[in-house]
């Protein structure tokens, strides 16, 4: 569906999935919301204390920084501290609000050192980055967007650092964007016919992601908690010559296709 715009097979799969969940008497319909905040780590699956779950995730992150990253040549104790501060900084910002210059001033270090730390953090698979959609020169000029490997990592660090967002829907929307980014990025890393994930760098009516296969028309993807109108996705379809676009939100309770826009509920997208 994502790759070809054909929704029928996905609808069939969605119906089977919903039927299986309804017939599972042990299934808790809050599970998906809990997964968005605390999932992604099978080793922690049986823990039911959410505060303990977040603490365990933070402990794993610190182990990666303080043990695995230390094994890298010339990685100093100061940069261990900087790495932890960068991760917490990222957890409290929108994905596109990272300026290496501002971050360097915040850490009182050089931009080159910030870039080096971010590169190493990517190698640990705690975070990943995507570039702006466009020409090679545009991608070089625009800053990268950074996301966490799972939305639960972002949530754990945010809770641990003191989340400053009071609007729960806004916060869940940020987690959902990270979750979708993670799924799409992992898809592109499996050697699936040269797919690349980008973000939309347009300043007006930009969508969240653009997925492209080689030289084929791109697929714009918009993500949001709650209901989303079609203005942004329609603008992206027209701007980039896309055949169709995808909105991942609570606008519909099931997969629906209206003209050249496919609506997908967040839970369904997670299972596809």
Model-derived regions: residue spans:
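Interdomain hinge/linker elements that couple catalytic modules in large macromolecular machines
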Residues: 2-156, 162, 168-175, 182
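A cross-kingdom feature that marks ATP-driven nucleic-acid transaction machinery
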Residues: 126, 130-272
């Amino acid at each position: 569906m994502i790759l070809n715009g054909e929704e029928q097979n996905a609808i069939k799969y969605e119906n089977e999935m919903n039927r299986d969940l309804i017939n599972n008497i042990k299934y808790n319909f809050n599970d998906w919301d809990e997964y968005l905040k605390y999932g992604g780590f099978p080793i922690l699956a049986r823990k039911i204390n959410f505060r303990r779950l977040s603490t365990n995730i933070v402990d794993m992150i610190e182990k990666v920084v303080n043990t695995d990253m230390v094994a890298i040549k010339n990685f100093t104790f100061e940069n261990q501290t900087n790495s932890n501060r960068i991760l917490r900084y990222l957890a409290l910002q929108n994905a596109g609000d990272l300026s290496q210059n501002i971050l360097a001033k915040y850490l009182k270090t050089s931009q080159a050192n910030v870039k080096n730390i971010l590169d190493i953090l990517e190698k640990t698979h705690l975070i990943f980055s995507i570039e702006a959609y466009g020409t090679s020169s545009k991608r070089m000029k625009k800053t990268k967007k950074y996301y966490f490997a799972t939305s639960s990592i972002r949530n754990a660090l945010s809770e641990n650092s003191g989340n400053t967002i009071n609007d729960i829907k806004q916060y869940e929307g940020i987690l959902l964007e990270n979750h979708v980014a993670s799924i799409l990025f992992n898809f592109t890393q499996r050697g699936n016919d040269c797919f690349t994930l980008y973000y939309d760098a347009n300043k007006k009516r930009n969508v969240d992601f653009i997925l492209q296969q080689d030289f084929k028309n791109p697929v714009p993807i918009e993500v949001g908690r709650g209901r989303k109108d079609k203005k942004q996705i329609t603008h992206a379809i027209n701007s980039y010559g896309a055949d169709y676009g995808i909105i991942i939100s609570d606008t519909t309770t099931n997969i629906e296709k209206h003209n050249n826009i496919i609506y997908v509920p967040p839970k369904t997208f997670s299972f596809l």
